[in-house]
């Protein structure tokens, strides 16, 4: 007899009521007396467990009664509806077969574990309630993102993970080399001779697929990328990881306004999709992780996002009377405390901050007519601060070259990027959404290490 997923039983209970069925899964809890016992089984298909009742008439009753948590079992039995019990139904077992035993020292016993402890056993933590919910939501959110863009005719573009350019101009990149670290070989200037390296030049893991994405947007009009990115920032905060995933759409014949409309529509779509398709997980997060989560997400999904320029935001912050840890001044970047004040205290909903000073933004952003600011936007959301950053891209070749010269960038390294402005340049825009930050926002989890399956952070590359 073919086994049935627990999710199917929950979603189609009437179909299986009174039927003999087979399920396969892992023991979450087990309690037994001399005459009968109860097992909570989880098969990974659904957040909730299913209860199995077994009685002393079972052929291997004594053996089953002593099984440890996380033992893999195959259960055959009749599905009985239990309207007067805590659970809606249970399986009355006629046979229980052990697929794989679990040692008694299994670390995830039935008690509350700290997230710090669970990070030490990242290979086992998806079996816990919290992380079962986190990674199921992560999967659904990823699907929602693809569905959102596919429904709108966007082309999914795979940009390279190994790159010779720095899209952010920040320089905090992981270098890739096959040169011998003890004897890399030097050139006449006494510097490492990268012409002898695998790619014949300095290469790194990508910090963004944006530049390559622009090339494809200027061919396909609307594209998006969704893949891993890497930052060699020696940061130990709860918001930073060295390896994370980014969603980066690029849209041609579009300006900053179009960019903001797309970002707002996308974020609302993801929220609505996850709340609709993972109600049990979202209720769990709302009850045990972040008690105001569902109200906050519903507020985001139903609000018209605010709009404020950077200059206006600075004035609001300066006149607020608040004492901030970081001083507020025009020309300095907004810190998380400033972002959260704006979105939580002033607007009380998500807000786009636009038109930042050019000196604190990347070289590729379009210069505004005032000559001092660029057509950039950051989306701030309550509880986190900045979640999306984007801009209209500079489509004027002369202005782009001027900006690169001012920032000391080597134009030869970006020759192909500059060429995009020579052959049918068009206004275009795009943004980046850090996927893990989106998952943190959806789940209420407060540390990025807890929304990545095997986090990579400074001095930590276990598993």
From Swiss-Prot:
Assigned EC number: 6.1.1.22
HAMAP family: Asn_tRNA_synth
Matches recorded under Gene3D superfamilies: Bira Bifunctional Protein, Domain 2, Nucleic acid-binding proteins
Keywords: Aminoacyl-tRNA synthetase, ATP-binding, Cytoplasm, Ligase, Nucleotide-binding, Protein biosynthesis
Subunit field text: Homodimer.
Family: Belongs to the class-II aminoacyl-tRNA synthetase family.
Pfam assignment, any one: tRNA-synt_2
Compartment(s): Cytoplasm
Name of the protein in question: Asparagine--tRNA ligase
InterPro entries, alphabetized: Aa-tRNA-synt_II, aa-tRNA-synth_II, aa-tRNA-synth_II/BPL/LPL, Asn-tRNA-ligase, Asp/Asn-tRNA-synth_IIb, NA-bd_OB-fold, NA-bd_OB_tRNA
Major place of residence: cytoplasm
UniProt-listed CDD domains: AsxRS_core, EcAsnRS_like_N
Top-level taxon: Bacteria
GO biological process terms on file: asparaginyl-tRNA aminoacylation
Any single GO CC term annotated in Swiss-Prot or TrEMBL for this entry: cytoplasm
Enzyme class of the recorded protein, top EC level: ligase
Keyword Ligase: yes
Catalytic activity: tRNA(Asn) + L-asparagine + ATP = L-asparaginyl-tRNA(Asn) + AMP + diphosphate + H(+)
